């Protein structure tokens, strides 16, 4: 039975780390046969401040052709994976603004029964990665979503240290091969889980 699965990978990044994780998660979803929309959240940093960080400007230049995320992408998707940095262990304003805009969809019940997951970097070993993942998971619960963690017995999951989602240590620079493999595995597992859920619901509907 063929089951089409639509995946939205939505991220915010001023450095390459989150973008690389988002691309890896996208690859994993593709490997699992998903139709994927890779979307970036818009920038809230004033241009005057942006130009004080040439590395930020370079990332923006490289990703400016990528479509910005909208709540329509979330409504469209069977799977939504969110990625953003972890400033002081808190949720970025960019992500909070996007979540606030989903209220009409939430009230209409259009965010329930979807598969969700998250990934994040932080500058320090204990820089709040777990708190960020848990805070996003709380949002997914309020939406009525189905949260899919990493594979618990996969050595990759043990390597990155957080079963809730892919994390990395940003101060090392570019993501390590194991961190990218974890994001790829996360995208693949979320897509496979959504396909199984859709197939099961279809069978139940046929029986009914």
Predicted segments with their positions:
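Short, charged/polar low-complexity linear motifs in solvent-exposed/disordered segments
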Residues: 108, 130, 136, 145, ...
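Short, glycine-/small-residue-rich phosphate/pyrophosphate-handling segment
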Residues: 112-158
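Noncatalytic linker/hinge segments flanking ATPase motor cores
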Residues: 48-52, 120-128, 155-163, 189-193
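Mobile beta-alpha loop/short-helix "lid" or hinge segments that flank ligand
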Residues: 41-46, 144-171
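N-terminal beta1-alpha1-beta2 submodule of the flavodoxin-like/Rossmannoid cofactor-binding fold
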Residues: 1-110, 169-208
């Amino acid at each position: 039975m063929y089951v089409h699965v639509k995946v939205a990978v939505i991220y915010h990044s001023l450095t390459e780390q989150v973008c690389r994780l988002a691309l890896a998660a996208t690859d994993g979803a593709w490997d699992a046969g998903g139709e994927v929309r890779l979307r970036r959240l818009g920038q809230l940093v004033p241009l005057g401040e942006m130009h004080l960080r040439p590395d930020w400007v370079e990332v923006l230049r490289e990703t400016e052709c990528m479509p910005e995320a909208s709540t329509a992408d979330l409504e469209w998707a069977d799977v939504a994976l969110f990625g953003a940095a972890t400033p002081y262990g808190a949720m970025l304003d960019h992500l909070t603004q996007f979540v606030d805009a989903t209220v009409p969809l939430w009230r209409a019940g259009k965010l329930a029964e979807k598969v969700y997951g998250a990934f994040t970097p932080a500058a320090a070993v204990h820089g709040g990665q777990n708190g960020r993942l848990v805070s996003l998971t709380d949002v997914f619960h309020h939406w009525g979503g189905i949260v899919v963690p990493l594979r618990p017995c996969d050595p990759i999951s043990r390597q990155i240290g957080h079963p809730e989602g892919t994390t990395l240590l940003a101060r090392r620079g570019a993501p390590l091969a194991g961190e990218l493999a974890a994001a790829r595995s996360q995208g693949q597992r979320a897509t496979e889980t959504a396909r199984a859920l859709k197939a099961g619901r279809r069978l139940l509907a046929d029986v009914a």
